[in-house]
């Protein structure tokens, strides 16, 4: 579901995996901007959400996933490696991910190596072309370098 009001857009996704840990948060920060009443909602545990986002990147290689991973890392979130391992064991690759770019050894260290390699090769041009519909130009400038720095810090080789 997408909510829009003036310049603010919020997208809500609903997942039904009942076994995933969650915690309760208030929507007040967003709903105040939209003139809606706040609600208490369950949200996915951040380490699990990071693992799922990393697995999603592995399966589709979208830079918006890289941005989301970077955002979690900047917040100091540590990945749930057990969840990540379970997700990379059975990937559902997009047809857009060439076989040569798929994870060969389905282990967490091999995944980190692949992730580091892909992030190291990113350019500002690629980031801008992919994320220009989502972020203003002022935020795109130098973002590839910020990705590289944060990923290297989180997953040193």
Describe the residue ranges of each PLM region.
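Structured mid-to-C-terminal alpha-helical surface segments
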Residues: 1-157
